[in-house]
């Protein structure tokens, strides 16, 4: 039987999805980087790692996390995109990141939305842009073949979890 694919070279308007996941080895390398010389790179890395530790939580969900979402050793929140309720066991590496940043006087868990009086969505978008530009810089420093963004943490967690049958 001869198989022919007459449309093999026809563009369908759908590009192949670029793989955004990185292996666990790269996640460890990102985690272990000494970024004490640049607080904005360190902040971006810490938010990337927080996302990874929280099963690849999206940046918008991290931005809107409230301290009240953390109770009895669990982080419980509604995903903005799907309105799905998610519950994640609170682990030491998550707490270490939270402890590193001062959010006293704020109801937010992470220092992304800093001023309740200012447009929250604008603050989130500005922070996302800053963090992703810093992550791209980090990715270049370690020679990643793809741009490092907050989205990579989500895909990395999913890929690593799948490989471990989680």
Language model regions located:
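Short, charged phosphate-coordinating catalytic segments
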Residues: 1, 51-72
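Short, charged hinge/linker segments at domain and secondary-structure junctions
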Residues: 1-15, 111
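Conserved tyrosine-mediated DNA breakage-rejoining catalytic core shared by Y-recombinases
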Residues: 5-10, 64-100
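Long, amphipathic, Lys/Arg-enriched alpha-helical "connector/arm" segment
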Residues: 10-43
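Short, contiguous acidic/charged loop-to-helix segments that flank catalytic cores in large enzymes
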Residues: 17, 35-38, 76-89, 117-127, ...
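Active-site/catalytic core of tyrosine-dependent DNA strand-transfer enzymes
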Residues: 21, 26-28, 91-145
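Short alpha-helical "packing" element that flanks the helix-turn-helix/winged-helix DNA-binding module
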Residues: 30, 47-50, 158
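Short, basic (Lys/Arg/His-rich) helix/loop patches that form interaction surfaces
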Residues: 32-39, 132-166
